[in-house]
Amino acid sequence: MSKPFKLNSAFKPSGDQPDAIRRLEEGLEDGLAHQTLLGVTGSGKTFTIANVIADLQRPTMVLAPNKTLAAQLYGEMKEFFPENAVEYFVSYYDYYQPEAYVPSSDTFIEKDASVNEHIEQMRLSATKALLERRDVVVVASVSAIYGLGDPDLYLKMMLHLTVGMLIDQRAILRRLAELQYTRNDQAFQRGTFRVRGEVIDIFPAESDDIALRVELFDEEVERLSLFDPLTGQVESTVPRYTIYPKTHYVTPRERILQAMEEIKDELADRRKVLLANNKLLEEQRLSQRTQFDLEMMNELGYCSGIENYSRFLSGRGPGEPPPTLFDYLPADGLLVVDESHVTIPQIGGMYRGDRARKETLVEYGFRLPSALDNRPLKFEEFEALAPQTIYVSATPGNYELEKSGDEVVDQVVRPTGLLDPIIEVRPVATQVDDLLSEIRQRAAINERVLVTTLTKRMAEDLTEYLEEHGERVRYLHSDIDTVERMEIIRDLRLGEFDVLVGINLLREGLDMPEVSLVAILDADKEGFLRSERSLIQTIGRAARNVNGKAILYGDKITPSMAKAIGETERRREKQQKYNEEHGITPQGLNKKVVDILALGQNIAKTKAKGKGKGRSTAKAGIVELDMTPKALQQKIHELEEQMMQHAQNLEFEEAAQIRDQLHQLRELFIAAS
């Protein structure tokens, strides 16, 4: 199943990339646990990491701080490694309201969630790839540190089928039911099976376009074939096939019965404690809820909120870390932490927030104390589990620098020859009028401007002032969701308006080559928003334009300003020297605007079957670019119904065309959600 990693790129490493690749590889081969890649905006950090993965041939997990950047990285890695397993592992909830209790108003909030089936399938595909192959890149969000089914139990539950194997049809059906597959002879969809005589068709939970046909003859597996679940066309026959459980949380029956006994013991102990403290209501509530859950587990093998009993189901002791995606990563795996200055603090904060909510539930009798062990990893547990790690950032945090010691690999030179912006410091007194004249100069030559303020009030007032003076301006604030934010950025790039005003929203991962000016108001007010890292990140937003310039408005130069200006000058000088030595003239980036949201259109093209379908699919995707996630989901459901209708009418060509369009829309939905 595994193939060697094969990097697909029209470019060869250049600038600082060859040296960065060599140093990172040497460090990994020498057994260094931590290294940092200090890569400036536009220097091709992802390309460098892709080269390291391809050269060392090691399974890799890439951690991103949010779904937007994870989707962007997934698209890029998919293009770099089209022949290998590039997987996507983020939270599969479209909406999630955890159960909670508010003592002040005596309000209990039930858990409420809506699961995205397509992302659930991608998560299952990611763990399957990690268990089966070596040529795997999993792009994950911080969801990777949350509890997942135990890999040992997951492996024990798998159903292995081989040609010539002696097995009764009923035994196969019973095993499929244990894997939580359901029988459905009418609608054949993911996670179901159907039976026709001695033929069993199984639609694997981790697959979206291939199903398995098991043909039996007198209790012997005669043939295993892979077929298209839509058209019924057989793609190939295979000598063996492994069917994975429908969910990561599936547990063998004997383990459930054992866990139930342990839950009863804990309930008895907890009841004594509550009664001793005269907490009669809490004792009654806990007994009632737990007995109901035990009844459900006995009858069905699972219950609502079964994750709260995960400690017993995975056979772990009190306080032990839960099984996570890291347990599926091979021992010689590689971890890449993207935008590490944001991702690392995020990992540290997840456990504490989760703990506070659960302690209230335990105290008031809604959950047993063991529910506290259904949690994300603590930071020290993450450190213990993490394999060899490369931190990637333009502004690494103190943690990464401390861990890496001297192993900070500089990637300052851009292959395009683009220089870091020229920085000017101007007085605060005339900042608004000065900014207005700068905006007019940029708007006249069809370039864009980003303005960052310190407060929401100032951002609103400035937006109003610029509008009154006839400028085309938009204000990007924290209430705007990810998708609307992406739409605003796209409109800025398309020239629907010239100026974007924001507070802390103009930093990581915004790729806007049209922006030639970044204005930072009140740059001399020392603090989080005007720290050295924040300033370098914000200045970097103008580093993708040939005429890039940053104006810092301040009456004095603070230590943070001095460091940010010094670092930017250092990078600029190094790039200038490289350009002179190699005769490079800086080239502006000509990145297509649809690239921001049209996640990996090449993915859809490679999946589309038949000539010309890739082009029509991509076109269909662009039409959908301005749709909200809700509208996209609605569109996906409509198309799925149309596709099934065509298949039932035996109109397989039309059904296949709709399926190709669905691939594109699902990729868009990932980028947008």
Curated annotation (Swiss-Prot):
The keyword DNA damage applies. A motif (Beta-hairpin) lies at residues 92-115. Keywords: ATP-binding, Cytoplasm, DNA damage, DNA excision, DNA repair, Excision nuclease, Nucleotide-binding, SOS response. InterPro entries: Helicase/UvrB_N, Helicase_ATP-bd, Helicase_C-like, P-loop_NTPase, UVR_dom, UVR_dom_sf, UvrB, UvrB_inter. It comes from the Bacteria. The UvrABC repair system catalyzes the recognition and processing of DNA lesions. A damage recognition complex composed of 2 UvrA and 2 UvrB subunits scans DNA for abnormalities. Upon binding of the UvrA(2)B(2) complex to a putative damaged site, the DNA wraps around one UvrB monomer. DNA wrap is dependent on ATP binding by UvrB and probably causes local melting of the DNA helix, facilitating insertion of UvrB beta-hairpin between the DNA strands. Then UvrB probes one DNA strand for the presence of a lesion. This is UvrABC system protein B. The gene is uvrB.
